[in-house]
């Protein structure tokens, strides 16, 4: 009997295929790094074919390494980097352009011009829960249609398909038989009305995007189709799709209102479960869909940080201050403090709660005594300060936060999580399975395949690996955070047209 679940976690810098058993225990995983392209300042792209090739390779390798066959897999689920935008030809399956990444800022001017038009901003926020920012898919689609020769005409004729990465992978897995997405990914496009749960004709007109481009929107657990026989040697049912951050919230068992998770990967994403209530933030957070099951929507309040683990990669690759990412932990702990150094990693602008697309990274407080260890520590501390920015915004929106559940690649760093607990002044719990996105995806896929009965079972499956308790004096905490706020203030650009009404 088929009893294993295959979860795809397609991220910004790598693709993973993770096998879980019927008890949602991790059995084996395989990962492949993928390339990011930076053709101009503020531009971030991927090769869609590389994304697909890496996904298929991971699936084949993880099965081989675990001595399993595709026939042993009861269900497949897909989680993905959100907002990243792909357009492809419906007949040939060929991408029209590279995938424009979620970090890409090329549409800043367009978004600012649109936001300056009377009534546009308030309407956009009310319908989508988002802000009018290059982060989301709508302006990326618009850019491709306007800048790739013949794209708009082909779209009008119904010859092109749009998808976030989940939708593109589904198309490839099913041999073009299924063009669909899920409610969480749809909610990150800027074209989906989260109140009415449908593509919004008024928003499509605003961005001049033909509706024929768009995929069908399904629940997170649904019958999305089957993998083509030729791909893995057996047709595997695809029973779940979900954006990676929402998948992590499920994997962290944040299924009750008031529960919060934070994922530390390339960026950092903090998500608060708000139940059946849409909370329009007064503090520049995003209202979004946490998950949709049986046509019932659970909403979330999210803060997005563009640069977290990417700052460590920056220390490693162009700067060569570290050899390996995990060297950052020992280097940060080897000095008592940063020596007054603050890094504001606004390499692609600043996300929540500032939403300044034109801000750029800066190092402050350098002296002749500054060592590379101080800079490395400042990079890790910056992740924690940005997290405090988000926590303050969540608290100011009326939420109560006593414990934060964390996951992602950076969550393996004990020093980082202790400093995070110290600077936030709250308990931080690290999940035993730091692959929370994959776990949440696997659980939903199993739910869709009938291996699990209800979402509540996830609560019993979640286990903490380690608890981090605040140890810093509150006065010291305030002093350090005040220095961060002053550093951020120096990087912010003159006010552009407001992105919130």
From Swiss-Prot:
Gene Ontology BP, a term: glycerol metabolic process
Gene Ontology MF: a single term: glycerol kinase activity
Binding site for ADP: 12, 16, 266, 309, 409, 413
Chain positions recorded as ATP binding sites: 12-14, 266, 309, 409
Regulation: Inhibited by fructose 1,6-bisphosphate (FBP).
Similarity annotation: Belongs to the FGGY kinase family.
NCBIfam families: glycerol_kin, PRK00047.1
Full protein name: Glycerol kinase
Organism: Coxiella burnetii (strain RSA 331 / Henzerling II)
Gene name of the record: glpK
